[in-house]
């Protein structure tokens, strides 16, 4: 079953589980377990009470929300009926993106500490085994944030070097840059008075860790003050100041991955064509009033009400909508029925025992972005498709 369908069913059942019979509650919990597995979670995540999402992930979430709202606004002139893309069911050779997944993986290594009077070091360890193998990693970046030292305007830049450790190293140990176990991945310069926030591409390294778990010995972050023109005392002082705020220096692995699924070719039926074929007077339907016709209705799903607010960061709920209403005979184009639905309605009108009536169902769906903690307290931003009903029709 598609993840979005499972999620919708689970949320509806969880909302009514408290007043339900024991068997119903058991079924609800089983459905919850299923959706958690589909999401790559072994159980309900239980992040620490003070756990927060990095600002960077919040920014990405808001960007996705803005893009979604912009797309919705551009469709504002369309009606809920008559904008369907018909699917002919033929498989296509291409694949389409099922979901975009962005994870912020926190490191479990040592502390940032002075290695000498002009540099600091930190060993970074990242658990990439938590990324499901069903996902294809598209990008992997080390995101570094070093706070600004406004008093450091009189010192040169910082050289930030990232090395891959090719053998096991004790945490909080000082590693010589001449050590043969080090492989330089990248070096960037940072103005300490302005601080630094940026990413370094380490996709090849992460892929090597993923293909061979025993090769994951982590990274070495080496931060060194460039030459202070003989003023070693000032350089040493700046390094001490930076060391004092080392807890504010952050290093996270940002992994972008995707899941793919087979797609189907679609034949577009444009709105203008549907309107030109529609009956001039929709009120002429004999068996249903306008208010009872198949249409979209509001349905707000609250994650707080189902007890998921501890691990879902955003949104706390969303408008899912649902389809309900009659599909009367004759079935007009404005009810967005397929050719099959029109034929089925005709046969049903002749002999209602031969075939059932067609049903009011979603004909166009859109996705939502969710920001949440996984079982390893990684922050995940994921786009789930087919979560919001955009249009309804008779099927």
From Swiss-Prot:
Superkingdom as given in the UniProt entry: Eukaryota
Annotated TM spans: none
Positions of the UniProt region annotated as Disordered: 69-97
One Pfam match: TGF_beta
Signal peptide feature range: 1-19
Molecular function in Gene Ontology: cytokine activity; growth factor activity
Disulfide bonds: 294-360, 323-392, 327-394
The UniProt record lists the keyword Phosphoprotein: no
Sequence similarity: Belongs to the TGF-beta family.
Assembly and interaction partners: Homodimer; disulfide-linked.
Protein name: Univin
UniProt organism field: Strongylocentrotus purpuratus
